[in-house]
Amino acid sequence: MGGPDLGDPVTLSKIARPEEELEAVSGAEGLVPVAIGIEIGGTKLQSAVVAADGHVLLRRSDRVDPAGGAEGVRTVLAAQLAGIINDAAGNRLAIRAIGIGFGGPVNREQGVVSTSFHVGGWSDFPLAAWVAGQVRDSLGAVPVVLENDSNAATLGEALVGGGRGARVVVYSNAGSGIGSGLVIDGHLYRGRASGEMELGHLRLFPGGGILEDSSAGWAIDARVREAVAAEPAGMLAKEAAAATAPPSARLLPAALAAGDATAQQILDAAAGPYAHALSHVVHLLNPDVIVLGGGVATIGEPWRGSVARQLEGFLMTPLRPSPPVQLATLGEDVVPVGAALAALGDQSRAARRGEP
């Protein structure tokens, strides 16, 4: 289990929030009000203590084995929570709420996981209630908010990341899957039941595949492997021979920086359908900014530039120029930060309404 990362000294001056909202989550004098944000993915589990301005004060991270199922993940999570709560107490941080960003569809109102596409045993599990029970002895009855991880990431990037200051923010993350979310005036858009903004499941053409088939990380990995096999003397093949891991999209940044044409073709082939899907979002919503995150976005400016350039070509003339396309800025912290801010926001609103 990873130890705490204390970062900069914690002071109240780091919390830039309207006074009435700060009062709604404030505790004993001298304690800094914070939330725990949790990310539960297929292989990664991380928790962070987050201030109301999105500043990460403490973090812990563990790898989990999907073969262990949901029960195995919960065993690791219980230990991780105990550790980070202890870290927070030692740094005079008052935990006021907990937010969870879960990698799959959830029923937010009930705090229940609908299902997981990567780890068995999560279907219909009351995760929010389970977490509340795990921390009750150490924290008392703190509110626990459950979000889909894409929604949590969207809120984080909209409030304190690449979309900060914009009124309408669309965020999309491309990794093992493709998710997205929408924030309007600082509030997540929520559709019916347990899902909305499922960009990765758009069918670009009737009877065709979904966007993830073309633009998810695994689809790009497959194209890289094909290129390595087809061009044994090419730059990607040379990079693959020098690498310890199997060929994947991780080979692209160096090849792109060197001007390799094959790498650019692979990138454009993934960015094109992605831009096409985003053009539908722009035609429907015309947001102020589009923020790109996820593992694929770590390719950086070449990915952002290809998506932005191709997006422009898909838009009707009155909607050009397209909304700015930005890279996400919160990195690995995006889901915990967004989940924590969602939890703090819920608690402050409840306090102003006089709810417990």
Task: Indicate residue ranges for each PLM-predicted region.
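ATP-binding/phosphotransfer module of carbohydrate and carboxylate kinases, centering on a glycine-rich
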Residues: 2-97, 107-112, 131-142, 156-166, ...
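Short beta-strand segments
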Residues: 39, 99-103, 147, 171-177, ...
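Short, glycine/acidic-enriched loop or turn micro-motifs at the edges of active sites
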Residues: 42, 152, 176
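Short hydrophobic alpha-helix segments
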Residues: 60-62, 117, 192
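A structural motif shared across PLP-dependent enzymes of the aminotransferase-like
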Residues: 104, 122-128
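A charged helix-plus-loop insertion that forms the helical arch/lid used to bind
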Residues: 112-123
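Glycine-rich oxoanion-binding loops at beta->alpha junctions
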Residues: 146-153
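Glycine-rich phosphate-binding loop of actin/hexokinase-like ATP-binding domains
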Residues: 164-218
